[in-house]
Regions:
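Acidic, Ser/Thr- and proline-rich intrinsically disordered linker/docking segments
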Residues: 1-44, 90-141
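Generic preference for well-ordered secondary structure
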Residues: 3, 48-50, 55-57, 75, ...
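Short, contiguous, helix-prone interaction/anchoring segments in small proteins
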Residues: 33-61
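Phosphoinositide-binding peripheral membrane targeting modules
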Residues: 55-94
């Protein structure tokens, strides 16, 4: 689900909390050593999300916020901010030349550059949280 979060509304907060959980508290975020990525350069994006990025030949940025039951990808377009809300059960991550996140019939590919490499520990943390979440629903062990 993609929401325009330029102006925060109470209904949007409720939808986000229902899909990916409430935000981590200050103490929890310190224990996790951060819950957000640094901004990364978007290299490629699926055609059904292209309307949410800058149309001119400009660099597009996004960052990822970790929640207890999923992630939120913040996409910046000028002065607007769009949120792509992805529960863990929809999230698929591919490590190619850069990183590609797929969910809900959409994808976003981040460029393999310095800012991407600075986020290596964040992606390890993200994968660990996804594995922990998936183990809750592993009924065959």
């Amino acid at each position: 689900m993609i929401l325009d979060s330029t102006y925060s509304l109470e209904e949007q907060k409720q939808i986000i909390n229902d899909l990916v959980g409430k935000p981590y508290s200050f103490i929890e975020s310190i224990k996790l050593k951060g819950i957000g990525s640094k901004r990364m350069v978007i290299e490629d994006i699926s055609s059904n999300i292209k309307q949410y990025i800058n149309t001119v030949e400009d660099i597009n940025y996004a960052n990822i916020e970790l929640r207890s039951a999923g992630v939120i990808i913040h996409i910046n377009k000028g002065l607007q901010t769009f949120l792509w809300i992805i529960p863990f059960y929809h999230l698929v991550i591919y490590k190619t030349n850069g990183l590609s996140i797929h969910a809900q019939g959409r994808f976003i590919h981040f460029k393999n550059n310095v800012t991407f490499k600075e986020n290596k520990t964040f992606f390890e943390k993200l994968l660990n949280e996804k594995i922990k979440h998936d183990l809750k629903y592993d009924f065959y062990t």
